[in-house]
């Protein structure tokens, strides 16, 4: 599948990785898949993909079933509602770096085994993962879950995607490595001494552009709105792409509005 065709979708391998965590706690796949609108037959198709919205719905269904927004990957659960509280705490931060720091500190208060530390310089902002020595070493999916939560929130708060420079992990290369490279960045290494993600530092001083009014729709759509890679739906590029998706195929008759401008008969997204 071409890279462009993968945008906005998630590999069935990540669906399987998510379900494996809920199975360990005796939760049946069928109910979770039904809530997400994912056909069970897709699990037998290694090249299948689901939409970000479907995977986001599965994410939320598993979190509700386990009452754990970290999917049981830490000895202390991240109870349902934790992400809401984290978002509210980070919303009043001064800038991007402080917002990320608040999210990381919140996770430190919630989880027992996996923590992160921030190290900022002129060249990069490093999110370094630290895990309790007595705990089992985290798998790649645990790192990714943590990252998606704090990264997705921070990108939304500043209204733009933060470029990633490099990522290193202590765990071995996962089976779905191609999917994790889409999630993180191309420069991604495994079996390394330390686990960390380097951010482009330009985001650090950017102001928070979200408000209490925009928080509600963000939480309603989370994590589907950032589960793949955060996109600001109000940015010019996204508006241009949305307009292009709404255009009818070449040669298709176009309706004319009362004001004389042309537009498809059906609005984009209308049923």
Enumerate the language-model features and the residues they cover.
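Generic alpha-helical segment signature
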Residues: 11, 76, 96, 143, ...
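Short coil/loop linkers at secondary-structure junctions
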Residues: 28, 39, 69, 160-163, ...
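Short polybasic/polar patches that bind polyanions
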Residues: 23, 34, 156-158, 182, ...
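Short hinge/gating elements
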Residues: 84-90, 132-136, 204-205, 225-226
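Extended mid-to-C-terminal alpha-helical interaction segments
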Residues: 179-271
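DNA-contacting interfaces and partner/effector-binding or oligomerization modules
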Residues: 115-206
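N-terminal low-complexity or simple alpha-helical regulatory segments
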Residues: 1-126, 149, 174
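Residue-level recognition of alpha-helical structural elements
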Residues: 11, 25, 29, 51, ...
């Amino acid at each position: 599948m071409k890279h462009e065709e993968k945008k906005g979708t998630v590999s069935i391998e990540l669906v399987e990785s998510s379900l494996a965590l809920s199975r360990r706690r005796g939760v049946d796949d069928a109910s979770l898949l039904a809530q997400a609108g994912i056909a069970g037959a897709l699990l037998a198709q290694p090249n299948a993909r689901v939409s970000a919205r479907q995977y986001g719905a599965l994410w939320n269904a598993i979190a509700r079933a386990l009452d754990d927004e970290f999917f049981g990957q830490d000895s202390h659960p991240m109870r349902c509602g934790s992400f809401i509280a984290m978002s509210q705490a980070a919303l009043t931060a001064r800038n991007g770096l402080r917002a990320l720091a608040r999210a990381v500190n919140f996770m430190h208060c919630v989880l027992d085994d996996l923590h992160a530390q921030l190290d900022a310089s002129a060249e990069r902002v490093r999110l370094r993962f630290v895990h309790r020595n007595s705990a089992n070493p985290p798998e790649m999916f645990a790192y990714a879950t943590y990252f998606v939560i704090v990264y997705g929130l921070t990108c939304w708060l500043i209204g733009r995607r933060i470029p990633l420079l490099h990522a290193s992990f202590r765990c071995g290369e996962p089976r779905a490595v191609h999917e994790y490279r889409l999630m993180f960045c191309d420069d991604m290494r495994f079996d390394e001494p330390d686990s960390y993600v380097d951010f482009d530092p330009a985001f650090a001083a950017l102001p928070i552009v979200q408000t209490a009014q925009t928080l509600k729709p963000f939480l309603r759509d989370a994590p589907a709105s950032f589960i793949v890679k955060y996109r600001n739906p109000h940015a010019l590029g996204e508006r241009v792409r949305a307009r292009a998706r709404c255009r009818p195929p070449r040669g298709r008759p176009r309706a004319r509005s009362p004001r004389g401008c042309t537009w498809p008969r059906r609005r984009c997204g209308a049923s």
